[in-house]
């Protein structure tokens, strides 16, 4: 069985380190074909045995290498970042451009934006600024069949129908991989 990207194997468990959505898609398709369970790993700050595999044939998808800020658009006040990017890195990128990313939780140097989105984190200033979903303009997601959906949008004001990507905020990755 040839694996689609670089991995570490331990018994029946495989840890994979994708670098982009296409590699996540390949992992999901691979896991479907060979009947592996998937366990996504972000910053591991919400440790309640969530990253402990419960099944023998498990692929742990570690998002640590998906840690790039792809763009800081100061005209539209939008930061595009991969899911493994640390919250602190996003806050620094915003501050460097004289912008504010108001989501602020204690382990900002360890938690990832993908994990924050999957739990719809609020943080210390939630009453003033809202939860993280209030600061997201779009997402690129990988569905459970490996399909990549791109909901990225640079329009600040968008009245085009319901925001389907909002379904994924707070889903705890039960629906997709961010």
Where are these regions (language model features)?
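Charged, low-complexity, helix-prone segments enriched in Lys/Glu/Asp/Gln
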Residues: 1-3, 141
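Glycine-rich N-terminal segment of FAD-binding domains in flavoprotein oxidoreductases
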Residues: 3-66, 81, 101-103
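Ser/Thr-glycine-rich phosphate-binding loops at phosphate-binding pockets of nucleotides
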Residues: 42-46, 86, 177-178
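FAD-binding subdomain of flavoenzyme oxidoreductases
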Residues: 68-72, 78-176
